[in-house]
């Protein structure tokens, strides 16, 4: 992977998600220079993944998955940690005609046992055939998958060692299943919702054209988890479908160092970023007077807010403090998303 971040400005003619499938969207984005960039909690970029490289690696991985004897429509469970490998597996499934299922990369209250129980329930309900987890989550996933008959549970490195099949990719169209998105589970156990290519592409077009009105010069930034609607649809798929570069900070790193969000918004000159109310509240409470001198948030034109109750006092507090750094309170944009309505 490159060590220089992907550019904001580029020469590829802009298209606002006017594609039939996600793989078609990536095929087009890969003709340009934009892509995804990943940062540590200390604000250092550790990986960059141009869409051209994402396409190449996803297609290689897709042939490895097909080499396992998987068939079109089989479900692939993916622990959705914020890293390049998740993007590669998600789009490998698109090319291979498989259905990715993003699973949470968070150990909630209750620790090991509760997380394993949660994963086990999700693996069962999703009817996954294989499952991938980064090294730090592998033991949890292996324990959760015991007795479920999965063909393989492994790390990205383990899947990379598989032989590739010399086969043509299956035909895909707008009626194919793109992925399975689990509901938030706010009131009961999360429910898997089947998202078809036609639905997700329509949703992406609406967001790009009418929601945030993305255009040349825009750049996205996100610390949202890849297994939630706002993170996956809004800040993974929207950038691909609009040929827009995006910068990522892991959710856990944000929770430990919330000011890094503002540092990286300043550094990357991102124009679009979303968060629930608590994200804005956490930043406003943690920021120090001396920090304000180092921020320049004048580029931030869309500050999306949603996923939980929107509290006006939280937004007012954030806008008042960050106004010193060039933040425009008119950037706030309420958003609403549900897996059931994608």
Task: Give the role of each language-model region.
Residues 34, 162-182, 188-189, 199, ...:
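Conserved pre-ATP/AMP-binding loop-to-beta segment of ANL
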Residues 37-88, 108-115, 171, 195-198:
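Conserved AMP-binding/adenylate-forming core of the ANL superfamily
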Residues 1-49, 53-68, 72, 96:
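N-lobe entry segment of adenylate-forming
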Residues 43, 112, 116-122, 127-174, ...:
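ANL superfamily adenylate-forming
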Residues 83-108, 121-130, 218-219, 237-247, ...:
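A short helix-loop-beta submotif of the ANL/AMP-binding
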Residues 201-219, 229-271, 286-290:
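Conserved AMP-binding/adenylation subdomain of ANL enzymes
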Residues 80, 101-121, 135-137, 244-265:
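ATP-dependent adenylate-forming carboxylate-activation enzymes
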Residues 265, 270-274, 286-342:
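Gly/Ser/Thr-rich phosphate-binding loop
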């Amino acid at each position: 992977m490159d060590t220089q971040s992907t550019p904001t400005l580029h020469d590829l003619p802009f298209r606002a998600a006017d594609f039939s499938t996600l793989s078609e969207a990536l095929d087009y984005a890969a003709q340009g220079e934009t892509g995804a960039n990943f940062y540590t909690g200390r604000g250092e970029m550790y990986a960059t993944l141009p869409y051209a490289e994402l396409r190449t690696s996803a297609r290689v991985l897709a042939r490895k998955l097909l080499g396992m004897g998987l068939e079109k429509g089989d479900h692939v469970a993916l622990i959705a940690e914020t890293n390049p490998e998740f993007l590669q597996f998600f789009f490998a499934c698109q090319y291979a005609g498989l259905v990715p299922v993003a699973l949470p990369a968070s150990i909630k209250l209750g620790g090991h046992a509760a997380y394993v129980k949660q994963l086990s329930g999700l693996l069962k309900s999703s009817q996954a055939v294989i499952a991938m987890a980064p090294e730090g989550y592998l033991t949890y996933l292996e324990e959760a998958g015991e007795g479920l008959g999965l063909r393989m549970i492994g790390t990205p490195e383990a899947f990379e060692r598989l032989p590739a099949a010399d086969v043509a990719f299956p035909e895909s169209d707008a009626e194919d299943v793109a992925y399975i998105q689990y509901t938030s589970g706010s009131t009961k156990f999360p429910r898997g919702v089947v998202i078809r290519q036609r639905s997700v592409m329509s949703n992406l077009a609406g967001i790009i054209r009418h929601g945030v009105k993305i255009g040349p010069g825009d750049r996205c930034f996100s610390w949202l988890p890849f297994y939630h609607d706002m993170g996956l649809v809004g800040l993974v798929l929207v950038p691909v479908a609009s040929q827009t570069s995006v910068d990522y900070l892991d959710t856990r790193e944000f929770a430990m160092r919330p000011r890094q969000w503002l540092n990286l918004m300043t550094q990357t000159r991102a124009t679009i970023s979303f968060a629930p109310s608590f994200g804005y509240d956490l930043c406003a409470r943690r920021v120090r007077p001396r920090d304000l001198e180092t921020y320049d948030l004048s580029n931030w034109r869309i500050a999306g807010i949603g996923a939980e109750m929107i509290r006006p006092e939280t937004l007012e507090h954030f806008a008042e403090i960050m106004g010193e750094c060039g933040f425009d309170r008119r950037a706030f944009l309420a958003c609403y998303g549900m897996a059931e309505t994608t």
